[in-house]
Design a protein with these regions (language model features):
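Gram-negative outer-membrane beta-barrel transporters
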Residues: 408, 447-453, 547-549, 569-655
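Periplasmic-side early beta-strands and strand-to-turn transitions of outer-membrane beta-barrels
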Residues: 227-229, 237, 252-337
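Conserved C-terminal beta-signal and adjacent last beta-strands/turns
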Residues: 6-8, 21, 251, 308, ...
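Short, acidic, small-residue-rich periplasmic hinge/interaction motif at the N-terminus
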Residues: 30-34, 41-46, 73-79, 87-134, ...
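Surface-exposed extracellular loop regions of Gram-negative outer-membrane beta-barrel proteins
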Residues: 325, 368-370, 429-430, 464-469, ...
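Short acidic/polar hinge/loop motifs at secondary-structure boundaries
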Residues: 61-64, 153, 180-205
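N-terminal periplasmic accessory domains that precede
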Residues: 90-96, 141-144, 148, 161-164, ...
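Outer membrane beta-barrel strand-and-loop segments of large Gram-negative receptors
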Residues: 294, 389-391, 395-401, 433, ...
């Protein structure tokens, strides 16, 4: 009994000491040139998980810190990073940051899993900032990627939109949100652009760190979970064809507890580019009510709670819901399509000591796709008013990761991951199919010399159906002065999805049946890259050359046509997924950014690709050869008013499609303006602009391989409100 009382007394004493030792640091961050407050600056505490962002007055406050000295690291996309040492309990700090015109201090985590300035990362990572998104007035992630990076292109048809990165479709690259992989269909459609802090883009294979599907690249969306007391904002945008987006964000932080809530509503009318379509039998044009761009409405709700038990131990819980339902014209269709997703996750992070910490995360994603019939339908035996679930997928991911500094030259990342995929389909008569994957990975960042560093990693995989596999990667970076030279090699792999193994699909226009294949093998690749970069205070330029060789690529193999297909399968053509292709992609990415003075910025990028399906001697499906983008911006402030004018241009060469032939080349130009009024309690930011300045429209008959679905020249208005705490 005495022992228990003694232990209890000691525990309570330690807790009391810990509480008494807690201190706070607060202050204000301003521009060194103008003394104006800097909004959205990030402050991190060394040897701690604590941090925050400045509010609309440039103020910050970090509590629950142990007494003693602390190193504050301050970063902002428009300013040079700064570090200062403070004593515990300091109040009213005034920190001044110098302007940075070329994003020189941007911090990234993609590619290594650890924090680096972008110019210090051993693997080349490009970044799209929240400022870039706002200047371009984008409303969706796929729009942002295409407008602001020439490496991305897209193709939209009756089955939806497919993004491509450096010639490879979206089956070959993955999306992360704050470093956590997103699963399910249409992942990028669920992202609320209003919450994005930055987008980090890693070109090339990275399966060693991120697992299957990371053959072509990784896109990591970093969201803005500001740690101020209260943050409330609203973003509204309306354009022609009923294109409406409304986002509302409400964040509350009480020190230890945080709540982050966001809602987004999107909707649009459908439109035709041509009122005619080609009859598949007579090849004559006939009138149609079918639309090239389908009307829809979509809702996204996300909630996240955080709890910082100490400055070294934190927890979170998150959940989200997304739905997207088409609005097809009654006279031309029998049903609408409804996609629904809900996801949830929990996690914790514990900092053992400076540079050493452990994270544990669990994430689940539940996706369903349904036919909502408003007429009777023979193909799917649907009745008007019925809803038929065509597919359900479940993804569960449990991961544990540790990062450890070993001496002054090594930073080791090790971890394990367990994934379960589940597929159900009423239309395909799939009661339930599932598979699990177990992975172990390790990666070491090595500082060889002062200007020379290396990265070496490997991932071991055991898949329930495809057994053992290992993927290594290695990267080298030499940094003399303002130059960065990088070389890398990575092996990647992609296991066939459950849909590719089991699911079927019917193309009604040409009566074609696609069936699965249980004998599929994993796709594998080797990726090589060389890059050079020069970074100056007022301009930067980078060049990246790469080669990607993919083996056992899954494609379609026609197994029956005509009478044989009708007799055996009841369709005119039957094809099966098979490992029949080898693909090669080599290309070059060039990007440049310059501050011209007097508020003028100019940036641009160019991508050249040579893609080849080796078996067929033709380009890879949905790939393009050349693309470039240009962004010109001017900004100026007059006391409480700031004007921002942005001109954006995008050029695409012809895009290849195995089914439809080439889509024509095109270019689109957009003019955007933002007008910011920094008032006492709110920042009011109206905007207006013109999309597709030169009124380009691909008006070929319905079901053509359209270059783009733009309805022609259109105007938009927007309004952003940010309430000050």
């Amino acid at each position: 009994m005495k022992v228990k009382l003694l232990l209890t007394a000691i525990t309570l004493s330690c807790l009391a000491i810990d509480v008494l030792a807690q201190v706070s640091i607060s202050g204000k961050i301003v521009s060194a040139d103008t003394n104006e407050p800097i909004v959205g600056a990030n402050i991190r505490i060394d040897q701690s998980l604590s941090g925050c962002t400045t509010n609309d007055k440039g103020e910050f406050s970090i509590s629950n810190l142990p007494d003693g000295k602390h190193v504050l690291r301050i970063t902002h996309v428009s300013y040079t990073p700064k570090s200062i040492t403070t004593k515990g309990g300091e109040k009213n700090l005034l920190i001044k940051l110098q302007d940075s015109f070329t994003n020189i201090g941007q911090v990234v985590v993609t590619g290594t899993g650890t924090h680096h300035r972008m110019t210090d990362s051993p693997v080349p990572v490009s970044v799209i900032t929240a400022k870039d998104l706002s200047n371009a007035s984008v409303t969706s992630l796929d729009e942002a990627l295409q407008k602001l990076t020439p490496s991305f292109s897209s193709m939209t048809n009756g089955m939806g939109t497919t993004l491509s990165l450096n010639g490879l479709p979206d089956d070959y690259f993955i999306f992360l949100e704050n470093g956590k992989r997103l699963y399910g269909d249409g992942t990028y459609a669920r992202i609320n652009v209003a919450k994005i802090k930055r987008i980090e883009i890693l070109n090339g294979a990275s399966s060693a760190l991120y697992g299957t599907n990371a053959i072509g690249g990784v896109i990591n969306i970093i969201t803005d979970d500001a740690k101020n007391a209260i943050n409330v904002s609203s973003d509204t945008r309306y354009a022609s064809k009923g294109r409406f987006t409304q986002s509302v964000n409400a964040d509350v932080n009480t020190g230890k507890f945080g709540s982050y809530t966001s809602y987004r509503r999107q909707q649009a009318e459908g439109w035709q580019l041509n009122p005619y379509e080609e009859n598949s039998k007579t090849h004559e044009l006939e009138e149609t009510g079918k639309v090239a761009s389908t009307g829809f409405y979509a809702n996204t709700v996300n909630q996240k709670f955080t709890f910082d038990a100490t400055d070294k131990l934190s927890f979170y819980a998150r959940g989200g819901y997304y739905d997207n339902k088409t609005r097809r014209p009654y006279e031309a269709y029998d049903y609408n399509i409804l996609h629904e997703t809900f996801n949830y996750g929990i996690g914790t992070q514990y900092m053992i000591s400076k540079g050493n910490y452990i994270t544990a995360d669990y994430y689940a994603d539940h996706f369903s796709s349904s036919y909502c019939f408003f007429k009777d339908n023979k193909t799917y035996n649907g009745k008007a008013g019925e809803e038929q679930v065509r597919k359900r997928t479940r993804n569960h991911n449990l991961s544990i990761k540790g990062i450890f500094k070993l001496g002054g030259r090594h930073k080791l990342s090790v971890g394990t991951e367990y994934i379960v995929d589940v597929l159900k389909s009423q239309t395909d008569n799939i009661a339930k199919e599932e598979a699990y994957t177990l992975a172990l990975f390790a990666q070491d960042e090595i500082k060889l010399l002062r200007n020379l560093q290396a990265l070496i990693g490997v991932r071991y995989i055991y898949h329930e159906n495809f057994k053992n596999h290992a993927t290594p990667n290695v990267a080298l970076m030499y940094k003399p002065g303002k130059f960065n030279f990088r070389a890398s090699y990575a092996a990647g792999f992609r296991t066939p999805t459950l849909s590719e193994l089991y699911a079927t699909d019917i193309a009604k226009k040409n009566d074609r049946l696609t069936i699965g294949n249980l004998d599929l093998k994993s796709e594998k690749n080797n990726y090589f890259s060389l890059s050079a970069e020069y970074v100056h205070e007022r301009f930067s330029v980078s060049v990246n050359a790469f080669y990607n060789n993919i083996r056992d690529m899954i494609d379609y193999n026609t197994i029956a046509t005509g009478d044989k297909a009708m007799e055996q399968y009841g369709h005119k053509e039957v094809r099966q997924r098979d490992n029949i292709a080898e693909a090669k992609v080599h290309g070059i990415n060039v990007s440049a950014n310059a501050y011209l003075g007097a508020g003028f910025n100019l940036s641009g990028g160019y991508t050249h690709l040579n893609t080849q399906d080796v078996e067929l001697g033709q380009p890879i499906d949905k790939s393009i050869k050349n693309a470039y983008n240009i962004n010109a911006q001017w900004a100026h402030s007059w006391k409480i008013y700031r004007l921002n004018i942005n001109l954006n241009g995008r050029f695409n060469s012809k895009r290849f499609s195995k089914s439809y032939g080439y889509a024509p080349e095109y270019q689109l130009w957009n003019l955007n303006t933002r007008h910011s009024f920094n008032l006492k309690s709110v920042i009011i930011e109206p905007g207006c602009g013109m999309e597709n300045l030169f009124d380009y429209m691909d008006d070929r008959p319905y079901n053509s391989n359209y270059a783009t679905l733009t309805p022609g020249r259109s105007f938009y208005i927007s309004l952003s409100l940010k309430f000050k705490s």
